[in-house]
Amino acid sequence: MGCIKVISVFLAAIAAVDARAFFHNRGGSDVIPNSYIVVMKDGVTTEDFDSHISTVAATHNLNKAKRGSETVGHKDSFNINGWRAYNGHFDEATIESILNDDKVNYVEHDRVVKLAALVTQPNAPTWGLGRVSHRAPGNRDFVYDSSAGQGITIYGVDTGIDIRHPEFAGRIRWGTNTVDNDNTDGNGHGTHTAGTFAGTTYGVAKKANIVAVKVLSAGGSGSTAGVIKGIDWCVTDARSRNALGKAALNLSLGGSFSQANNDAVTRAQEAGIFVAVAAGNDNRDARNYSPASAPAVCTAASSTIDDQKSSFSNWGSIVDIYAPGSSILSAAPGGGTRTLSGTSMASPHVCGVGAAMLAQGVSVAQVCNRLKQIGNAVIRNPGTSTTNRLLYNGSGQ
């Protein structure tokens, strides 16, 4: 997700201010009109941040009165392990004023973010669990350490989760909702991914605790700001429950490149949450997608049952690991099941194995490296400059 490209009247002002990291927008139909994410420089104090917000509010109100603008101004503030930012709905004059504040690092357009699943294939076999626990293909038995993620909290940042589904009985709670007022999974995507990372039947980390964080609507879309707000909530919740270092976060979603999105997931990882993300489903280089392009997180591409790159899967040097993503059976809202394909399905396999490793004492900082070290070098035609390592849980099988 690129940052805003201001019209020419702003360029002189931008050049005059401290050469901040102000990124130019690469265009695209996913831009949310007049909606922006403003990221502050490192080291900005609470007092400076609050003063900036007050100044922005006053400027916005003045410009609104002058021009009859219908923009709503500042919306939400974020503080993810010291990374301070906010989003809002501003006119161009207010954005010009924001850019002239030397406490501001950069500004981005807010953009649409979507889930990374593809199609439903009825009655497809479930094969992913057996594949990630064996060096050789074709084994349906899932072999795993008995700790199975016990004591680890996994945040499913998605379309919500059906918290009444028997797959999650006694291990799940609703967290927060940044997209609407409906605390259910009207899409099914979030329930499916949760079933893979921690479901009793279809899951990898079968004893992990689960938190539903809804950032995408029933239609499968949301905003970068809404995703960041959800991540901010996860870090705050984990800190309040003394779960940092014992938590994982799954992001089976994405959009075009966003430095703000990448910064947010990086700070969450640095705070002590293992972050797994989907590479994306456009058969393109994942470095142009966020949060997949954040180097600090574990980016998952999708493989097929015969150890090939899924035709839809993004690729590239930013990909850390392949994981099963084609025709994956998992939970569906209402107590049922469904089969989906996508890098959305690969990411929760990685998240679940990562959570299991955390339960075994591997540190958050080392989980992704460990996965890459022990992964099976079996993926055929993985893509240009892309790893051929397939996720493996270290079962010894």
Curated annotation (Swiss-Prot):
The keyword Glycoprotein applies. InterPro entries: PCSK9_ProteinaseK-like (IPR034193), Peptidase_S8/S53_dom (IPR000209), Peptidase_S8/S53_dom_sf (IPR036852), Peptidase_S8_Ser-AS (IPR023828), Peptidase_S8_subtilisin-like (IPR050131), Peptidase_S8_subtilisin-rel (IPR015500), S8pro/Inhibitor_I9 (IPR010259), S8pro/Inhibitor_I9_sf (IPR037045). Pfam families: Inhibitor_I9, Peptidase_S8. One of its GO terms (biological process) is proteolysis. Belongs to the peptidase S8 family. Glycans are attached at N250, N393. The keyword Glycoprotein applies. Residues 1-19 form the signal peptide. Residues 126-397 form the Peptidase S8 domain. GO terms for cellular component: extracellular region. The active site is at D158 (charge relay system), H189 (charge relay system), S344 (charge relay system). One of its GO terms (molecular function) is serine-type endopeptidase activity. Its main location: secreted. Secreted subtilisin-like serine protease with keratinolytic activity that contributes to pathogenicity. It is found in: Secreted. Residues 35-116 form the Inhibitor I9 domain. The lineage of its organism: Eukaryota, Fungi, Dikarya, Ascomycota, Pezizomycotina. Residues 20-116 form a propeptide. It comes from the Eukaryota. It is an enzyme of class 3 (hydrolase). Keywords: Glycoprotein, Hydrolase, Protease, Secreted, Serine protease, Signal, Virulence, Zymogen. This is Subtilisin-like protease 3. Its EC number is 3.4.21.-.
